[in-house]
Amino acid sequence: MKKLFLGAVSAVALLGGAAQAADMKFALIPKGMDNPYFDLSRDGCMEEAKKIGVTCIYKGPATHEPATEVQITQDFVTQGVDGIAISVADADSVIGVIKQARDANIPVITFDADADKSARQAYVGTDNKEMGRELGRQLIKLHPKAGTFATQSGGPAAANLNDRLAGLYEALKGAGWTEVKGSPAFCNDDAALAAQQLTDFYTANPDVTAIIPVGGWALFAPKAYQNFVNTVREKRKDMPLVMPDDLPVELQALKDGYADVLVGQRPAEMGAKAMDILLKLKKGEKVDPVNIAGLDVVTKDNVDKFLK
């Protein structure tokens, strides 16, 4: 009888835990909902949330706008969601709202882009400095002789992109490369502007050895990006094209000859892990403060594997 009673208690406890998890709502906040990169984080979030029995709410600014991101985060705090994962557009701007969430006993983590000076409890995403280094290493592999380069970033206050720039500079400047005047340019995650800036770099510096962004924004304006590459390769067939990320449009660009190498992140993995980490935090469990998602190097030799 005692064993039966204990078994019944255990079953009730398990059912109670499952019911509690089913009621939990976790917010995933991207820098901008117009960025296809974050669609994969959303998909990973939704799939994992269904698997573990929680709800993933995906909402962010329509486009890259740090002030709007802060307001959306504030709204989630007011609504009393059970946890928040945010890809931080401006590391300084979120410090206050993250503290408010923590004061309200709402777990907060960052994904993709960190704010390590805030009260966030964990980060899940790329080692961005290493990604910058890898971009540089791939360029040097294609063009061993030191030359000149221009680079492009998204928002100047994005910690992840600044880390990526630092890694790129470490790799290239350490190997004797020189950055051209006007670099880096900042596109604020705007694909059309990003493609135009690449063209502008080439127009102003027709002898530049390479133009190597730290984000793949330009490839999401395919026609404009293809026009840029076609213009360059009419005169410079040997210009190496090393691009970040490996979303389907970028993989197809590589397959079609509009890139030589892609250094890809794993945004779906970030979205999924964000749900797992928030659930653990909500249950009072310990989590690792830094959770690194890996990188993938894609070339013409293995692109078909990634396109499947």
Model-derived regions: residue spans:
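A residue-level marker of the well-folded mature domains of exported/periplasmic proteins
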Residues: 3-5, 13, 20-308
